[in-house]
Regions:
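Secretory-pathway lumenal glyco-enzymes, predominantly type II signal-anchor Golgi glycosyltransferases
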Residues: 1-326
């Protein structure tokens, strides 16, 4: 009898474990890669269209700031998608890139988009948002639940608010609360744009695959979206459009079945309206955070993935180093 070495006894199950992990990894990669290609090849946004306005949303405004545009002619309205508990981001934005009402003599108006708090402390959270609204007068809210899957409802609310209460704005920007905006450069860009009612620009996403993998956040089912590719759209981190186009999109939204991703949903509307995305000439929109560099941040318009403390720090650095040349 020849005893089996202890090391060999442990190696056998280890081999099987490694083999299983290898097969699982290959299988996962295959699924993620090829399942994205199983949808309908040619994207047809009219698939989502209904002749009757059956998708008109009837959520009620619980905070609406309906008089903000009554006595002014805004050049630009910036609507920031936020969540009830994200007070720090709103405070950071108010103290930094939304702190000035005028840039180059043009009136800028910034407001925040919220749904109802989903947490256990609903009453307390709602009360604090109400207090915040009284203090700053810059919160728009409807009575849907504030969840990731309801971001499209929040964007529909934004377009409805502009249409009903601020139809005189020249431009609209929809952005997120974790975005740093160089407001001066944003206004400069808008002043350079052609006076067209079809202007729509931001960080363009062209020929983006509909994701069918395991990440719930980016997954979309075939039932909800049966096509391989999304139509051209701009990332929801910050897109800008003509005020009249915003009203046309809102009117169309009543006919378009909402999908999970608000930026793709707006892209579907643009496609049906036959509006092309204007691709910025310079790289000024950043989908992912870039490290702070004074000259880079002086040149950009919007960068995504920035914390409230970074928004404040970056703004202070830019404001205190105006004499530095790039």
């Amino acid at each position: 009898y020849c005893p089996v070495p202890v090391s060999a006894m442990y190696m056998r199950p280890l081999k099987w474990i490694l083999l299983f992990l290898l097969v699982f990894s290959v299988g996962t990669m295959w699924y993620v890669t090829f399942s994205s290609n199983n949808g309908i090849e040619h994207t047809n946004p009219m698939y989502f269209y209904e002749y009757e306005p059956i998708y008109k949303q009837h959520y009620l405004f619980t905070l609406r700031e309906h008089s903000r545009c009554r006595d002014i002619e805004p050049f630009l309205v910036i609507l920031v998608s936020s969540s009830p508990k994200d007070v720090n981001s709103r405070q950071a934005i108010r103290a930094t890139w939304a702190s000035q009402n005028f840039w180059w003599g043009h009136r800028i108006l910034t407001l925040f988009l919220l749904g109802q708090d989903t947490g256990r402390e609903d009453d307390a959270a709602a009360l604090s948002v109400e207090d915040e609204s009284i203090l700053y007068g810059d919160i728009i809210r409807q009575d849907f639940m504030d969840t990731y899957d309801n971001l499209t409802l929040k964007t529909i609310m934004a377009f409805r608010w502009v249409t009903e209460f601020c139809s005189n704005t020249r431009f609209l920007m929809k952005t997120d609360a974790d975005v740093f905006i160089n407001t001066a450069n944003l206004v400069k860009l808008l002043l350079k744009l052609n006076a067209s009612e079809n202007v729509f620009t931001g960080y363009p996403l062209i020929d983006n695959f509909a994701y069918r993998g395991f990440s719930r956040k980016t997954y979309i089912s075939y039932d909800e979206y049966p096509f391989q590719l999304y139509p051209p759209y701009c990332s929801g981190m910050g897109y800008i459009l003509d005020g009249k186009l915003a009203q046309r999109i809102y009117e169309l939204m009543s006919h378009i079945k909402p999908i999970k991703f608000e930026d793709v949903y707006v892209g579907i509307c643009l496609n049906i309206l036959k509006v092309n995305i204007s691709v910025p000439e310079d790289e000024q929109f950043f989908l992912h955070k870039i490290n702070f560099d004074l000259c880079k941040y002086r040149h950009l318009i919007a960068v995504h993935g920035i914390t409230p403390s970074e928004i404040i720090g970056f703004w202070q650095d830019m404001s205190s180093n105006t004499s530095v040349t790039c």
